[in-house]
Amino acid sequence: MKIGVSGASGHLGRAIISELLLRPGGYEVVAITRTPETVSGPAQGRFGDYNRPESLAQAYVGIDRLLIIPSHDGEPGKRSVQNVAAIDAAVKAGVKHICFMSASGVRQEEEPALSASYWRGEQHLIATAPAWTILRMNLYAEAFVQQAQAALDQGVLAGLAENRVAFVARGDVAAAAAGILIGDGHAGAIYNATGPERLSGAERAALIAEITDRPLAFRVITQEQLHTGLTKAGLPVAGVNAVMSIQASLAAGAFDIVTGDVERLSGRQPKPLRDVLAGALNSPSV
């Protein structure tokens, strides 16, 4: 069986490729990326660009199961177009089973909300793919490491609401995705990759303080305060919009969910946030 990963040059894509190559079964693994020359090892590199649909149709030929990982393009509406085009290219290429990486709490929204592109991709996949699976994921624990480091510098961990989040390690998402791609019985399923525990803002701040032995409190701020802070930090408009959208979803409880899907799909328990934070925050640079 030939398995393809589209968007394979990013952190998640590379992690999934590594997971697939570790699994027994003699699968042929194809990494589809704009830089196929960087693909090494047993995996085959193929050129594919989400902004050039014709390249995708060629890259997907001969693949039995394909995972589409959306790009990080922040231009409003662009990712929606890319997702639809990638799915259409996979159908045209004759891919039998198409999997799509999405986000927890996805719902119908207007651009530039990040959820809009995931929603459109999910709906188009369900309507057109011969067989499909969706893997929604919670916020990365690794992304929270960056927020924690900034919070330590500022002396406060800020958020739009005191909502709980079950952060998930990137490696656990990769293992779950690999489990879908090599396993059977996943057609028509929607899974949620989450961490094992839901932590409130105050609990997250307390965890950071415990690990680093530095005082830290959690504080609720307004959307205006968040927007101003991001702008002053020098983030581009697309970056500000992305963070605002993610924080709004967090405040709405989109990531306040714990499932057993990571263990079900990967065969191993997901890492708690503490394990991810400990190594990063105990480094000499923090």
PLM feature spans:
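Oxidoreductase cofactor-interface core, primarily capturing Rossmann-like NAD(P)-dependent enzymes
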Residues: K2-R34, N51-E54, V61, R65, ...
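Flexible coil/turn residues that form the inter-helical turn or adjacent wing/linker of helix-turn-helix
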Residues: E197, F255, Q269
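Amphipathic terminal alpha-helices
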Residues: D261, Q269-V286
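Short linear loop/turn motifs
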Residues: V243-S249, V276-A280
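Short loop/helix-cap segments at secondary-structure boundaries that form the rim of catalytic
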Residues: T35-A43, Q58
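Rossmann-fold cofactor-recognition segment
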Residues: S40-R52
